Amino acid sequence: MKLNIAYPAQGTQKCIDIEDEHRVRGFYEKRMGQEVEADFLGDEFKGYVLKITGGNDKQGFPMKQGVMHPTRVRLLLSKDSSCYRSRRAGERKRKSVRGCIVSSDLSVLSVVIVKQGDADIEGLTTETVPRRLGPKRANNIRKLFALSKEDDVRQYVIRREVTTKSGKTYTKAPKIQRLITPRRLAHKAQLREKKVKAIQASKDAAAEYAQLLAKRVAEKKSEKAEEKKRRASSLRTQSVQA
């Protein structure tokens, strides 16, 4: 079984081929997301704690979180499911996936170092791979450099050097997202003003309608009163004639 070990703290990754199956038996019957003490792998892993993140079996089928089974199963998967990428809107497909319980059928097991042990592992904890890209969002840049809201974020953007095929070198920086600029503030103020105007116009229209409705109701009442008066006078005239 191959063991794909990642160390996110230093951005390194290493694949170790373990031919003796007895050495990896400590992972059997464990589930994805479970943390395992890795002392059984050898002296170099003494004190290390590894978290199981996934794996593939010998036919290449991936492990799926939430499927409580040590073997392969066929599931009807949709757009939001892991282990499946839908090509069309609303498409679903029955796919073979492996359960989240580790068994001897796996060819590759992916783990992450949660706690470092006593000894260093060559090529994993001894090296540091810097991140290729820095943060892009304004708040994340502020958090990285401990900036206040008054500081200009644009001066702290992490730039990287890019070399073209012709050998020319230039620096490249990401476009800062969610950056508060005078233009953005003016746009927000404009939208707010438009909203206030719309609310006021709606209130004015409602008041005008209520006034018109009251006028119509009053007119109808007066018409009814006039009709009633006319009828009463005509009845009085008829009774006098009789």
Curated annotation (Swiss-Prot):
The keyword Mitochondrion does not apply. Keywords: Phosphoprotein, Ribonucleoprotein, Ribosomal protein. It comes from the Eukaryota. One of its GO terms (cellular component) is ribonucleoprotein complex. GO terms for biological process: translation. It holds the Pfam family Ribosomal_S6e. Phosphorylated. Residues 219-242 are annotated as: Disordered. PROSITE patterns: RIBOSOMAL_S6E. The modification Phosphoserine is found at S233, S234. One of its GO terms (molecular function) is structural constituent of ribosome. Residues 219-229 have a biased composition (Basic and acidic residues). InterPro entries: Ribosomal_eS6 (IPR001377), Ribosomal_eS6-like (IPR014401), Ribosomal_eS6_CS (IPR018282). Belongs to the eukaryotic ribosomal protein eS6 family. This is Small ribosomal subunit protein eS6.
